[in-house]
């Protein structure tokens, strides 16, 4: 008797691409907007100064009347807000997860972006010496000595913390990706790749509107998308290959409400903050 060929693994239903793009654009904009303005800009005001520029991917504070400690606190406020976003989102996913796949994926994406930004900045500042945890006057580790040692510590801690964030995010999403083996890994990889590419296009596109030129695109807009969220490019390889999950699993459905919200947020953020506000 000739053995019958093995049946091909069942394929998860495809997520709606337009809705994934909208969810992703909204998540990236909310993550960076809260980091910059609920974090840096608000801290600048609360600590006795005022922002001189409110950009899409940066906030400049008038440091002339602030002590070095307060300047460090302004720098620290952005990563603290990003960390808080991530913690709140992942606690929500554990305690009261949204029933709809669209809402679940948005909260997961926003939380992952928040934690990636908080830990990624440690690595970025350690490698470059600039940014929120940098050793320049507007960084948390200004005048830290010896500078090279602090930067090595930041780099190592940032890399380790970033990897832990990736593991946490994958572990949270793992039970929701339908299928088995390579099929579910490929599905998850394509899903988050679509989100990553959306974030890159939106971030760089809006970043190009800034009045300071390509330097802002390189160190702020591109760094927050290409760099901080680069874990999306490889994280789904960590999914449990042996874990079967009943189909359909997490499938993003077409939703014109999410599409309209994502488009509106992108346009408004680009118009208001892209060219930079000078209050």
Predicted segments — roles?
Residues 1-15:
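Short, Lys/Arg-rich, polar N-terminal cytosolic tail immediately upstream
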Residues 229-245:
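Transmembrane alpha-helical segments of integral membrane proteins
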Residues 240-263:
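Interfacial loop-to-transmembrane junctions
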Residues 53, 61-170, 188-200, 228-234:
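Metalloprotease/metallohydrolase-associated module, dominated by Zn2+-dependent proteases
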Residues 15-16, 23-73:
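Small-residue-rich helix-interface/hinge motifs
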Residues 68, 208-231:
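Short alpha-helical packing/oligomerization segments
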Residues 94-104, 174-184, 244-250:
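Membrane-interface helix-boundary motifs at transmembrane edges
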Residues 267-279:
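Juxtamembrane boundary at the C-terminal end of a transmembrane helix
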